[in-house]
């Protein structure tokens, strides 16, 4: 006998009672309430045996039997009535089969008796002995027993449920373990259970399953059955013939025979169908609710938690008052099994919903009330889950969370919740979850993963949410402890990226998260790397351009210019040289750009010359043909007009000295060119650039034949070489006269020339420089001088360079600009022992620091100067001037900080020694002897300062007052020079620094307030030179005094003096600078370099005085204008970008005079001022003053055109500033419009020639200049012209075909679009509202043209042939490529103006919603259109505009498809559009979609537009978001079927609708068929069954049609399974 699982048979040694594990799960092997067909059978208890413990307990008896322990019967009766065994439901031979089926059983247990009706050991116990087996239910046991029977004959195949695989048995056994302890109710009578997998035959019988009842003919044992066996013989009538042909043939011969036969078969089928159809009406009624007391309600809930109580019994008394949050809490408290809890929720919900209908409300109101109730119920579920999750730490929290998650997920997937509300709440909760509860929400995320990522609306939000959480976790202080959480978040992000790539298209936040996303992927993996690259490209295409134009990629030439400018601060020639060679492939263009940079008037300083020379030397070593590049540069005559060619000749001179430039090659080229026959008509006519180099070449190191050839060419060019020799001889005599100790006497015939002329050629300058260097070197190499210099200071001073001689040599070489020779002279000067000369040498190195760093002499000179200082220190003649100079120079050398520290220690030691020395008694009588009239004043002061004794404060005050009086009288009858007095003041300061600073500040303030403040301009430079006052401190003091009080009598003169304090001397002025004056120039240069903003403030304040002065001060106005213009030019050329910004902020719009001075300065730099006579080229920090007219200038259109023509990579900031001045000038409005027209034409011209200078002209101008009102802006004009360009040009014959060549309109549209993209940063955040309707109309027109073209092609396909067919094919191909271009261009415009489509912007327009819907419809229909050439599926070339190609080349390239890009743009719009626009677009596309656009066949349609508001909320599995076609990195070739999914091969979604007529179009039988389409008056789609009425065991008595909807509506039949 096989015991049934409901009988509660326990395994060996198990307790008799059921143990509840708290899981709330139970396995009911029999449906509750199923009628028991065996209950009416007579039952007789089988005598059971009693053995020693453990005893066998008979649970197979009837319910009324008492379990008693009786001794086993010795012998069973043989003639037991068959009915007694029939109640057990097993044949008599079961015991035999059972005993033979346990080969694995141990021998310790008693063997089974084959003659007993029931085995001694239970079948469950036998199975428990088998390794790996567990408790199995009755069905599994029955299957095993059936399996152990002898196999049937080979000719018959066994039943499908027999010989089940072991894995199925194991799975059933494993599933039984959870519910094994929950036994069946004891009062349920036992009955035989039919196997669930047995085939059902007519009459509710089961094939090959006939339990032994004792009354079957097979069970009757007689002689026949004993001998022959039993078989079921079919009774055949004797009148039956072998064939029906004779009877049917006669009927078929008649004409109506077939109809009769057909009607007979049809009637038979109709009767069968009518018999099998469910015709009874629906008997479904939700179980009613009754009012119960609290005790009965609790008892009912306990019964509900007990899985043994059938639900049909509980459905009679469902108590009132259990709803909402209370229902869920009760289920959690009572541990109601999840399935039974869901059953209760459905019962309550069905009653609540049906209550709305019973109130007599209308249908629409009922639906609204039902939806409201579902939303409230969903909110209760949300609160319930939140409460369980937030109760972390309480008892059984893990079990409660598990139960709550299981229950809510079951309610979700049973369609008992509002999915939109629930998932939105889930994402909101996940976003707000702290780190301590985030793991729970991540576990729940796995449950709703596919539902969230089914639509982009939720998928994008989830992607940003996870990335934000990961970013916060990584940046958290407790990041190490959050490592598991970080890994889990990274895993989710990686899975989302690889499986749902489209959800990672984040137009708003890609730049924020792209680095974080790349860290989550394994970029070493090809798949991960390809997905990330394509994803980055997709995001870049849908992103709005950055606000700043500077973030865009710079052209190589501008990048090279930045590298050249960086040398001024980094001084790294090697790295810049290598980077420049990598930046530009054309080396000739690179050399050309370097020479332009060195000679442009828009850069400052002579250091560019030596930078260019060193770079050219390195490039020549690297293999660049520098000579040819330089010669070709000189041959361009148009370049010499805009450049300072003297710098170019200087570079060539340096190259000739180092033998880097081939003079012979240049002369050969000059002879081959034929310019040697050039003859000037006038001596004042300048030579051309290539010929002028012949005059500038240094000749000292040239071979004799090359020298002679040069002289010959000069003679033919009209230049006499003898003039060079005479000029050199005159200049040598003049220099020798000024330096007799170095060069000795000169010939008396030479004529002195002082000062030196400024137009000397580099041939003369180079010869004189080398002569001076040779003379200084020979002067310092005299052995007698060198020997005496080491022992005797007097001899050293007699034979070494004196300060005057050093100043003269330095002045000559600086006027030449020959700093390489000056570096050699400074090297020779370091051997002398004069502290003044050494300090001056250190100041010279500091003044030309950038040039010497490029030359490579700075470090060596500094080390030599430090050695000279150490030598002086050993000799006991320490100089404070030298220490100050060395410290200032060492601070600019990063590698000499230790040396600077030692120098500062020496300086502090000297200062402390002076301040701490005790004054001698004689110092009390010193003040009375100090008098400025004393002829021995300086001698006494030197003795006092050089003595070891200190100076008290009274003595300091006396000496300070005496020196100050000398300074104040320096303009008249002063006995001492100002520089000398200031030097003594600097020597006096170390004794009492604080008191001295206080006294000097008090004196300066007194001068500022007095009427004699004019002397301040005379004494301030030397005070700055000796270090007693700094320029920055003085400027700060002046501004503080001007703000504090107005007692300064001469504010106007003070502002002018302050301005002129910063202006360098003019070119003609003598440059003989002593130590103090040179240091002042050094301080001014450093101030202009470090504090340019304060310099602009000084210029602004000074220029403001021009408007307030009277006519009598006209000369002063001109002088002020000169100074301001020169200083502006210096500041503009030192740092153009920042200087232009400062000018826009501080000068423009302040004063008319400021604008005028700035205009003149710019005109001088740009060469626009006719009065200026050309450019003002800087040379050695000097400028040529040119008178300016301070009157206002009226802007002219020709000036704007010329400024635009002058725009290049160097003049760009100055042209920007000039155009800005033209815009801001007070003139008529039409002038502004004309200027805008000029700039727009320049933009079009530059775009056509692929230049980008116009972008810089517009990008850095002021806000008002960039955005003019309405269409006067350049970008708006480009947009206007872009939209005015016709989409398609009609053919001249007027037929429906399109013009074969519309390239002109396409090229024009490309130019306008390029301009719009370059200026896209100027689009406001709110977006221009006028663009939206225009874009919508353009896309509508594009769609209409596509529809008409499709109709035209389909209508003329059959009629066209021959030449007409070829012409039509060409026209169609041209149309499709134009369509692809315009579609991509309009998509780009949508991306640029995406902010105009946002919800705040759309709220201003009343028709915003229809425009948004039309825009989405157009994008979907065009992108998913199936064109013959599949141009929308081709990878866009370069700027993703289609290009002409051969048929063989029409293959998809790796990258983003234009179709995918279009859908990405649609996704970015959907992210901003309201849900109503999305719903209207979906409604239109599913009802009125054009036939050529198979939108509904594409799963991306549902992904982008879902969830649909009016879609049924039934159990329909919608397709999840599919990875992009390009996400895999490989794009398949376009197939003729027009499958637009591409990428991975995705199977077509199955049609969820049965019974679709075969005549339907293909567009209806598709993946979107669940959208309930209307066809011929019938609704085709899944029937929306109410999930609340899908109740099992709803009624106490099961009916024939116990369903919520009549099964007859679905052609359902009675099928017994």
Curated annotation (Swiss-Prot):
It is found in: Nucleus. SMART domains: Med12. Residues 66-80 have a biased composition (Basic and acidic residues). GO terms for cellular component: mediator complex. Disulfide bonds: none annotated. Keywords: Activator, Nucleus, Repressor, Transcription, Transcription regulation. Pfam families: ARM_SRB8 (PF25326), Med12 (PF09497). Residues 1523-1543 have a biased composition (Low complexity). InterPro entries: Mediator_Med12. Its main location: nucleus. Residues 40-51, 99-111 have a biased composition (Polar residues). GO terms for molecular function: transcription coregulator activity. Component of the srb8-11 complex, which itself associates with the Mediator complex. Belongs to the Mediator complex subunit 12 family. Component of the srb8-11 complex. The srb8-11 complex is a regulatory module of the Mediator complex which is itself involved in regulation of basal and activated RNA polymerase II-dependent transcription. The srb8-11 complex may be involved in the transcriptional repression of a subset of genes regulated by Mediator. It may inhibit the association of the Mediator complex with RNA polymerase II to form the holoenzyme complex. This is Mediator of RNA polymerase II transcription subunit 12. It comes from Aspergillus fumigatus (strain ATCC MYA-4609 / CBS 101355 / FGSC A1100 / Af293). The gene is srb8.
């Amino acid at each position: 006998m096989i015991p049934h699982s409901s009988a509660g048979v326990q395994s060996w040694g198990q307790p008799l009672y059921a143990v509840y594990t708290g899981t709330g799960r139970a396995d009911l092997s029999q449906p509750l309430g199923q009628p028991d067909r065996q209950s009416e059978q007579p039952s007789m208890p089988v005598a059971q045996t009693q053995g020693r413990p453990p005893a066998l307990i008979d649970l197979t008896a009837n319910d009324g039997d008492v379990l008693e322990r009786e001794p086993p019967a010795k012998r069973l009766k043989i003639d037991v009535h068959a009915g007694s065994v029939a109640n057990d439901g097993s044949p008599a031979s079961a015991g035999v089969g059972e005993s033979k089926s346990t080969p694995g059983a141990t021998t310790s247990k008693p063997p089974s008796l084959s003659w007993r009706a029931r085995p001694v050991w239970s079948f469950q116990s036998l199975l428990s002995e088998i390794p790996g087996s567990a408790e199995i239910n009755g069905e599994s046991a029955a299957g095993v027993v059936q399996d152990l029977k002898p196999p049937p004959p080979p000719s018959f195949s066994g039943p499908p449920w027999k010989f089940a695989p072991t894995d199925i048995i194991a799975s059933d056994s494993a599933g039984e373990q959870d519910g094994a302890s929950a036994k069946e109710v004891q009062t349920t009578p036992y009955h035989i259970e039919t196997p669930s997998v047995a085939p059902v035959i007519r009459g509710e019988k089961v094939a090959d399953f006939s339990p032994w009842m004792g009354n079957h003919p097979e069970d009757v044992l007689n002689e026949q059955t004993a001998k022959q066996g039993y078989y079921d013989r079919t009774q055949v009538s004797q009148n039956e013939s072998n064939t029906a042909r004779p009877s049917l043939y006669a009927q078929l011969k008649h004409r109506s025979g077939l109809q009769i036969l057909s009607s007979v078969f049809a009637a038979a089928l109709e009767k069968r169908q009518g018999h099998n159809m469910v015709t009874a009406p629906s008997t479904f009624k939700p179980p009613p609710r009754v009012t119960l007391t609290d005790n009965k309600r609790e008892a009912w809930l306990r019964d509900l938690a007990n899985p043994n109580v059938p639900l049909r019994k509980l459905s009679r008394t469902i108590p009132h008052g259990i709803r909402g949050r209370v229902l869920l809490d009760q289920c959690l408290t009572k541990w109601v099994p999840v399935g039974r809890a869901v059953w209760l929720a459905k019962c309550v919900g069905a009653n609540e919903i049906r209550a709305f209908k019973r109130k007599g409300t209308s249908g629409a109101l009922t639906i609204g009330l039902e939806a409201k109730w579902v939303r409230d119920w969903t909110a209760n579920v949300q609160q319930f889950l939140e409460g369980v999750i937030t109760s972390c730490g309480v008892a059984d929290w893990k079990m409660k969370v598990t139960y709550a998650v299981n229950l809510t997920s079951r309610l979700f997937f049973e369609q008992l919740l509002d999915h939109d509300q629930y998932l939105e709440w889930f994402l909101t909760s996940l976003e707000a979850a702290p780190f301590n509860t985030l793991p729970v929400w991540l576990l729940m995320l796995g449950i709703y993963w596919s539902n969230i990522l089914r639509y982009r609306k939720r998928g994008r939000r989830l992607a940003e949410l996870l990335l934000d959480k990961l970013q916060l976790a990584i940046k958290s202080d407790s990041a190490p402890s959050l490592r598991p959480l970080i890994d889990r978040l990274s895993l989710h992000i990686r899975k989302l990226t690889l499986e749902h790539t489209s959800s990672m298209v984040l137009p708003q936040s890609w730049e924020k998260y792209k680095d974080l996303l790349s860290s989550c992927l394994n970029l070493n993996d090809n798949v991960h790397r390809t997905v990330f690259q394509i994803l980055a490209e997709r995001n870049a295409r849908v992103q709005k351009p950055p606000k700043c134009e500077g973030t865009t990629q710079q052209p190589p030439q501008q990048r090279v210019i930045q590298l050249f400018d960086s040398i001024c601060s980094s001084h790294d020639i090697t790295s810049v040289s290598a980077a420049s060679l990598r930046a530009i492939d054309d080396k000739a263009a690179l050399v050309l750009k370097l020479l332009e940079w060195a000679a442009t008037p828009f850069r400052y300083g002579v250091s560019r010359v030596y930078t260019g020379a060193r770079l050219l030397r390195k490039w020549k070593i690297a293999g660049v043909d520098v000579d040819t590049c330089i010669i070709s540069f000189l041959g361009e005559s148009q370049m010499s007009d805009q450049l300072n060619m003297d710098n170019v000749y200087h570079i060539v001179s340096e190259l000739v000295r180092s033998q880097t430039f081939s003079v012979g090659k240049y002369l050969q080229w000059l002879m081959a060119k034929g310019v040697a026959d050039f003859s000037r008509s006038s001596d004042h006519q300048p030579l051309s650039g290539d010929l002028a180099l012949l005059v500038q070449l240094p000749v000292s190191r040239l071979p004799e034949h090359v020298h002679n050839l040069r002289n010959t060419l000069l003679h033919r060019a009209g230049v006499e070489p003898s003039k060079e020799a005479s000029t050199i001889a005159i200049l040598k005599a003049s220099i020798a006269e000024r330096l007799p100790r170095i060069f000795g006497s000169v010939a008396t015939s030479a004529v002195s020339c002082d000062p030196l002329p400024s137009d000397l050629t580099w041939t003369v300058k180079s010869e004189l420089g080398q002569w001076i260097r040779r003379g200084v070197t020979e002067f310092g190499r005299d052995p007698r001088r060198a020997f005496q210099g080491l022992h005797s200071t007097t001899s050293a001073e007699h034979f070494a360079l004196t300060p005057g001689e050093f100043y003269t040599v330095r002045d000559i070489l600086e006027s030449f600009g020959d700093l390489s020779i000056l570096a050699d002279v400074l090297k020779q000067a370091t051997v002398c022992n004069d502290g003044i000369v050494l300090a001056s040498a250190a100041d010279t190195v500091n003044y030309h620091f950038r040039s010497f760093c490029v030359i490579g002499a700075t470090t060596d000179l500094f080390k030599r100067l430090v050695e000279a200082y150490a030598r002086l220190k050993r000799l006991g003649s320490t100089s404070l001037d030298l220490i100050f100079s060395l410290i200032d120079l060492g601070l600019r050398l990063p590698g000499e900080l230790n040396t600077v520290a030692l120098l500062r220690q020496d300086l502090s030691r000297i200062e402390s020694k002076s301040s701490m020395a005790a004054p001698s008694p004689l110092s009390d009588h010193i003040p009375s002897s100090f008098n400025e009239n004393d002829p021995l004043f300086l001698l006494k002061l030197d003795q006092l300062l050089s003595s070891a004794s200190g100076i008290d404060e009274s003595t300091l005050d006396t000496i300070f007052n005496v020196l100050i009086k000398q300074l104040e009288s320096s303009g008249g009858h002063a006995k001492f020079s100002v520089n000398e007095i200031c030097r003594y003041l600097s020597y006096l300061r170390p004794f009492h620094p604080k008191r001295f600073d206080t006294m000097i500040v008090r004196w300066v303030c007194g001068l500022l307030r007095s009427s004699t403040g004019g002397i301040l301009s005379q004494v301030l430079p030397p005070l700055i030179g000796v270090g007693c006052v700094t320029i920055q401190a003085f400027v700060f003091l002046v501004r503080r005094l001007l703000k504090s009080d107005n007692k300064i009598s001469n504010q106007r003169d003070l502002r002018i003096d302050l301005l002129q304090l910063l202006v360098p001397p003019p070119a003609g002025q003598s440059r003989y600078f002593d130590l103090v004056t040179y240091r002042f120039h050094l301080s001014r240069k450093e101030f202009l370099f470090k504090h340019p903003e304060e310099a602009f403030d000084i210029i602004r304040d000074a220029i403001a005085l021009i408007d307030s002065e009277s006519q009598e001060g006209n000369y002063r106005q001109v002088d002020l204008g000169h100074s301001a213009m020169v200083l502006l030019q210096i500041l503009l050329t030192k740092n153009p970008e920042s200087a232009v910004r400062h000018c826009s902020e501080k000068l423009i719009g302040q004063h008319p005079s400021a604008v005028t001075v700035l205009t003149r300065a710019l005109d001088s730099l740009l060469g626009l001022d006719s009065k200026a006579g050309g450019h003002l080229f800087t040379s050695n920090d000097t400028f040529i003053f040119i008178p300016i007219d301070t009157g206002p200038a009226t802007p002219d259109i020709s000036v704007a055109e010329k400024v635009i023509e002058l725009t290049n990579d160097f003049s760009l900031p100055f042209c920007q500033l000039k155009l800005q001045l033209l815009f801001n000038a007070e003139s008529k409005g039409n002038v502004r419009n004309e200027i805008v027209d000029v700039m727009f034409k320049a933009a079009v011209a530059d775009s056509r020639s692929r230049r980008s200078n116009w972008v810089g002209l517009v990008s850095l101008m002021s806000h008002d200049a960039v955005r003019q009102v309405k269409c006067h802006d350049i970008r708006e004009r480009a947009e206007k012209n872009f939209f005015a360009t016709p989409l398609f040009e009609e053919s001249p014959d007027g037929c429906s075909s399109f013009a074969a060549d519309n390239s002109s309109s396409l090229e024009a549209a490309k130019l306008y679009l390029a301009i719009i993209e370059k200026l896209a940063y100027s689009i406001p955040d709110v977006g221009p509202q006028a663009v939206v309707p225009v874009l919508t109309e353009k896309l509508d027109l594009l769609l209409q043209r596509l529809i008409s073209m499709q109709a035209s092609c389909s209508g003329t396909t059959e009629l066209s042939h021959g030449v007409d067919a070829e012409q039509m094919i060409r026209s169609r191909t041209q149309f499709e490529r134009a369509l692809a271009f315009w579609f991509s261009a309009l998509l780009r415009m949508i991306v640029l103006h995406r902010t105009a489509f946002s919800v705040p912007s759309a709220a201003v327009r009343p028709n915003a919603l229809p425009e948004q819907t039309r825009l989405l419809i157009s994008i979907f229909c065009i992108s998913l259109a199936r064109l013959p050439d599949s141009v929308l599926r081709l990878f866009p070339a370069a700027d993703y505009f289609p290009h002409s190609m051969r048929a063989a080349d029409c293959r998809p390239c790796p990258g983003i498809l234009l179709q995918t890009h279009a859908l990405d743009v649609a996704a970015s719009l959907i992210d901003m559009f309201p849900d109503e626009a999305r719903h209207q677009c979906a409604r239109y596309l599913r009802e009125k979609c054009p036939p050529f656009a198979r939108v509904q066949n594409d799963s991306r349609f549902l992904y982008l537009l879902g969830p649909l508001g009016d879609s049924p909320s039934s159990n329909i599995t919608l397709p999840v978001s599919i990875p992009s076609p390009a996400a895999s990195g490989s794009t398949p070739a376009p197939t003729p079927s027009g499958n637009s999914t591409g990428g991975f091969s995705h199977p077509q979604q199955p049609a969820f609708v049965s019974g679709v007529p075969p005549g339907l179009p293909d567009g209806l039988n598709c993946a979107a068929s669940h959208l309930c389409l209307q066809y011929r008056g019938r609704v085709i789609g899944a029937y929306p069954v109410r999930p609340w009425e899908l109740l099992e065991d709803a009624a106490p008595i099961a009916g024939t049609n116990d369903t919520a909807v009549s099964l007859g509506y679905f052609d359902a039949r009675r099928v017994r399974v």
